[in-house]
């Protein structure tokens, strides 16, 4: 059973260094021949739906629908407050890994209490989406068990919304992510709200490269704070044995300006380019599994528990 660490030490003066995965696993192209048969079998039972679970097109942010006002307001607050300085401060706050000790499945269950207010496609508790994504990947890539598990856990950083973690506001946890310390690309959802972000008026941060060097690699780029980065750092701290492909997907799955619009590629290095096909592959199941198809939790739980035991310690420091 997880437990909360009652007394927190003082915050350190600087954040922990961002670490690349140390594994040297060979990267496999998800379009390789050995996956083709499995993908074809999957496509007979899962095809990209035309509409999301609310009956609208996917990722539509500029039309009126039942959740549009709330989504727009979240991005307005997000884009005003996600500054380079804020990003550094909140990393110091949350990368001490002293908020809780609990296992992976317990953290999945915590998300039952939340709906992502930034998501125009989904109005269900998060655990439904996690299992939909994991099962969709499992059918398409039956031999890649790490990929199934990645689908299950990819949003677990949203536990930051829970009182155990200080009830962070949704704008600091969910939504699309983007680099801080350089110009905000126009492809970012609701780009217009960056006009009120102080970094938009700071000459250090307004050029294409900003404080970075071209080709420096995404691991050297400070991203807007959210559940992606938090979970990535938790997994690194707890020495997961998931391959680097999984960690890259977890860290950048909300970076739509990159994997959907092709922005910020000038900051990528060779490692990032090798990982990117897996991010594209994952997004198909992350986005288009948001439907009314329900997953029998008790039926699939034993399978995922075996994967959790394979790749994680019994309890993790969060």
Name what the model sees in each region.
Residues 122-298:
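Divalent metal-dependent catalytic cores for phosphoryl transfer on phosphate-bearing substrates
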Residues 91-128, 211-218:
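Active-site flanking loop/helix segments enriched in acidic
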Residues 1-106, 113, 318:
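Non-catalytic interface/linker regions that flank or bridge core catalytic/transmembrane domains
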Residues 2, 12, 51, 66, ...:
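Compositionally biased, low-complexity repeat tracts
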Residues 299-318:
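C-terminal helix/juxtamembrane-tail motif
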Residues 7, 11, 45, 114-117, ...:
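Surface-exposed polar/charged interaction patches
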